Amino acid sequence: MDNKNWSDRASASGIVGKSLSEFICDDVTRMYVATMIESVRVIPHTSFRPYRCDTPDMKRFMQMIITPEDNGWIRISHELLRIEPLEKPVTFSTVTEFSPLRQCKNNQTIHFVRCSICNRLQRYGNRDNTWYEADSLIARSHALSESLKVIYGVCLDCLDKLR
């Protein structure tokens, strides 16, 4: 899709003019993105940040480019670097009704924490900082008949890259 078509679709969908934070579903990722943007504001430089934006059957390796503008604004653009097929398709369902006590309000079972940056998964409640690629984790378990229920966060590897 070219930039003109994307701009038209984004405008028609009400995306343009909204705060970036409205599209981020968890506090940790929201703070991560705010820190990236603020670092470019404080020390004007272009920052290149790799991330993943997968589909159910493809790993999409992307790069976010954060650039300060002369007028004080920040330009954020995205570039697709490469695509790889997943070994097995996997879908996710975001659990959004989540209390501070880590219990779902609507009785959904949370399976994993999904890193918003690299898309790796950590079993929910696991404290050993082991994160897995979705397709390798699924390949070792049964075939999935439903979406994996996840909450989002940022793994320590991705947090370390922010420094």
Where are these regions (language model features)?
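Sensory/regulatory domains in signal-transduction proteins
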Residues: 1-94
